[in-house]
Amino acid sequence: MADVPRDAKSALTALYWAAVHAVAPGASLRAALERVPMQERGRRVWVIAIGKAAHPMAQTALAVLAEWNRTPAGGIIVAPNEEAAPHPAVEVRAGDHPVPGPRSLEAAERIGLVAGRVREGDEVWVLLSGGATSLAAAPEGTVRPDELFQLYDRLLGSGLDITQMNLIRKRFSRWGAGRLAVALAPARVRNYIVSDVIGDDLAAIGSGPCVPDPSTAAHIHQMLDSAGLWNELPLSMKRSVSGAERDPSLETPKAGDAAFAHVERRIIASNRVALEAIEARARTFGYEPRVLGAALAGEAAIVGRRLIATLRSYCDQDASSLSGRTGRTCLIWGGETTVTLGAAHGRGGRCQELALSAARELAETAGLSTAALLAAGTDGRDGDTDAAGAIVTRDTWRTIQHAGRDPSRDLASHDSYPSLDAAGALLRTDLTATNVMDVVIAVCGPPADDKRARLTPAVALEAIAGSLRRLKE
C-alpha cells in the first residue's frame, strides 16, 4: 500500500489526484467501447474529439480501432493545445479557452469540413469533454464572430450558473443545440461524454452538439433579461431570439427531429465518480469521509463561508462521538460555483475565491486549528491562471497579511490569486486532460499515523465495493 501522507495538505493533494485518476478519459472511453457488440464493429468510423480531454480520448479511440483491425475514415481533434496527430487521417487543431478566439473559429470550420465528408452508413464517434463550447466556437446564422465572443465574455462575469450560460451560448453557436447531429445525419453517431456540468445534463455538456435543445427562445430571452444582458445584445442576436419566439420553425433542433434517431449517448466519466474515488481513498488515510453532494453552486465567496460552518459542525460531532469514529472528519463536495465580477477585478478563479473566503473563516472560527480545505478544478486550471485551485488552513489568512497583502481587499475585488500565491497556498498541477467540474475537500486533522486506523477490513471492503460499482456503470 502507498505511504500515507503525514499532514493534511499532503493528504488533500493526494485525494485530489485520486479524483483526477478516477475520471481518466482514456480508460473510461476504452471501457465504454468494449461494450460495442461485435456485429456493430464493421462500419466505416470517423472520430471527432472536442474538449480538454480530446487528445487522450482520440488516442484511445484510435487504439481500439486498431485492435479491431480498422482504420479511421478520418476525423479531427480540437483541444486547448496542439499535439502530434495520432493518425494521418485525423487532423489536430487547438482552440481558444476559456474565451473563444480566432483559433476556435478555425477549429469550428474544420469540424464542418469533416462532417461534410461523412456519408450514410458511416459511424461517427463524437468524443466530448469540458471546454468544447469555447474551443470550437463559431456563430450561427447572421451573428458575427466578434458578437459571439463578446457575449461569451459577458456571460463569464454575469453571475449566471454554468447551465444557464450553456443554454444561452449554444443558442448562437454553430455546433451547439444538436446542430452537429443534424450535420452528421443520417450517419450513426456514438456520443461519448466526460461530464463537466451539475446533474450530468446531456443538453448542457459542451453545448449539447448531439442532443436536442430543451430550451425555447422565450426562455433564453427571459434569462438574458434577468441578467441585465438583453439590452446589451447586438441586433443580430435579438433578431435570432425574437424571430424564433414568433416562428417555431426557426427554433433550435428539438426532440423528435429525425437527426437524433441514430444518435447514442453515454456519459463515461463524471463528478460523482471523482467524489467516490476521494471517499474511498480518504478511508485509507484514516478519515471519516462524507460526500455531501455533487451540486455545489452559488457565489464562490459565500459558498466558502458556508462550507467552513458545515465543517465546524461535523468536526464537533465527530470529536465528541462515542461510536468509534476517529475524529478525523473529511467532507467532500463537487460542482461548480460562480463569481459575479464588477467593472474592475483582479486575477483568480472561482476555486481560488472560494478558498480565500474559507481561509478567512478558518482564521476566525474557534475549534478548527487542524482543519484544511482544498478547492480545485479537475482540469488543472482555475480561471485564467496557472493554478488548479488552492489549499488553505487556519494560518493562511495571517500568512497573507504578513506578506504585505490585504486579503480582505483582494477577496472583495476578486483578486484571490496574489493573496494565495503570497501564502504558498496555490495548487499547481498543470493540465490534467480531463474535466468533471470542481472538487472541494475539507478535513479536520492530519491523516492517521496508525496503520490500523487507516485500513480496517470494513474500510477495504468499502473501497472495493466502490470500485466495483464504478466498473459496472
List PLM regions with ranges:
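An N-terminal, well-structured beta->alpha segment
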Residues: M1-I48, P56-M57
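Short beta-strand segments
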Residues: I48-A49, I76-A79, W125-G130, N191-V197, ...
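A glycine- and small-aliphatic-rich helix-loop capping segment at beta-alpha/alpha-beta transitions
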Residues: T60-R70, A89-E91, P139-Q150, L184-P186, ...
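Glycine-rich oxoanion-binding loops at beta->alpha junctions
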Residues: V78-E120, R169
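Glycine-rich, mobile lid/loop segments that gate access to catalytic sites or pores
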Residues: G112-A204, P209-P212, A412-D415, S419, ...
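Gly/Ser/Thr-rich active-site loops/lids in small-molecule metabolic enzymes
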Residues: V143-L160, D213-G228, A344-L373
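Accessory alpha-helical/coil subdomains and C-terminal extensions
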Residues: A187-R190, P212-R306, T310
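Internal helix-turn-beta structural module
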Residues: L356-K472
